[in-house]
């Protein structure tokens, strides 16, 4: 990844960074909640974004 990124690439990286976080705990406490964890969690070394 070059240090001088295009704006589009930077936007994609920023979105991926925001998505890559654990589930908020208050969501797990809701009634009839089926979600236990964030299934779309991504590790920087294991899974690459492909951009």
Curated annotation (Swiss-Prot):
UniProt signal peptide: none
Gene, per the UniProt record: RPL39
Matches recorded under PANTHER family: LARGE RIBOSOMAL SUBUNIT PROTEIN EL39, RIBOSOMAL PROTEIN L39E
Listed name of the protein: Large ribosomal subunit protein eL39
CC terms in the record's Gene Ontology section: cytosolic large ribosomal subunit; preribosome
Database matches in HAMAP family: Ribosomal_eL39
Cross-referenced InterPro entries: Ribosomal_eL39, Ribosomal_eL39_CS, Ribosomal_eL39_dom_sf
Family per record: Belongs to the eukaryotic ribosomal protein eL39 family.
Annotated localization: Cytoplasm
Presence of keyword Cytoplasm: yes
GO biological process, any: translation
Subunit (UniProt): Component of the large ribosomal subunit. Mature ribosomes consist of a small (40S) and a large (60S) subunit. The 40S subunit contains about 32 different proteins and 1 molecule of RNA (18S). The 60S subunit contains 45 different proteins and 3 molecules of RNA (25S, 5.8S and 5S).
């Amino acid at each position: 990844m070059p240090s001088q990124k295009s704006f589009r690439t930077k936007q994609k990286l920023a979105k991926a960074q925001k998505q890559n976080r654990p589930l908020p705990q208050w969501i797990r406490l809701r009634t009839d909640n089926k979600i236990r964890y964030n299934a779309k969690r991504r590790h920087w070394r294991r899974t690459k974004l492909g951009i």
